[in-house]
């Protein structure tokens, strides 16, 4: 008995989890999609099928993230879920009564305040990556280091460089200046970790007092797998927080929990292995012409006749193709 989720963002990562009826993770994937999330998801699902015991089956499936609708149309995924709700479901499962959730991914950031079991407010930052994981990764690459190695070195910093929380352009200049002044790689790494945290707390969330976060705090997202960022957060806000061991999979895990909660015993509509082995997609373009926007639509046609339309700026173009 299994429920599966696929988180399909438009950035470089695709995540997936497979759980049993008790919510335990049986299988997970966290990796680059090389710019083709649909192909990545197909390979993940095929891998799941190949590893399932003979009598096991997929009970229900859920997709979330920016690629949700494409994956649903292409692969027959049962449900879609709003990404913030998926993250909340996972956080509540791990820390019942959670009051504050901060998720920092590779290119975006989201913060949720929870009161009495309901999401009270949501803050998002998708316009600038200066406070996200790709920001640190780029600096690590520039220094010829792996992000994991760069993060670990930051834990041994003696005098973290104060880099502020400005945009990447200014930060590049500040890092170069720090290097000229003799700052160590460890101090630069720790300084960047503090910058990520300060950007989240003081620019995105605009928090004035750490007490506003409550007592039950979860941090998640791939960026918090960086121990230096985790420690910088704890020192900045003056309290311990919970970082799940599945911090980079929380959206996928939460959506799998959604699939579990919606299981009606009728089985899943997720494409079987035979269909995935023969999967094809044909893309064409067409002008809508149903309103003054005159959108140039991209029409994706799948082998079973299903169509998925993008680039329409209103609902009138959704039925073409």
Give a label for each model feature.
Residues 110, 261-321:
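Acidic, glycine/GT-rich loop-and beta-edge segments that sit at the periphery of enzyme/chaperone cores
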Residues 89, 133-138, 245-274:
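Glycine-rich phosphate-binding/hydrolytic loop that grips phosphoryl groups
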Residues 1-47, 121-122, 126-128, 313-315:
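Short glycine-rich, Thr/Ser-proximal phosphate-binding strand/loop in the N-terminal lobe
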Residues 78-84, 234-253:
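Conserved phosphate-binding/catalytic loops in two-lobed NTP-binding clefts
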Residues 34-37, 116-159, 261, 302-303, ...:
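Glycine-rich phosphate-binding loop plus the immediately following alpha-helix
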Residues 173-202:
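Adenine-nucleotide phosphate-binding core of ATP-dependent small-molecule kinases
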Residues 64-67, 195, 208-234, 247-248:
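Glycine-rich phosphate-binding loops at beta-strand->alpha-helix junctions
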Residues 1-24, 98-118, 287, 291, ...:
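Gly/Thr-rich phosphate-binding beta-strand-loop-beta motif of the actin/hexokinase/Hsp70
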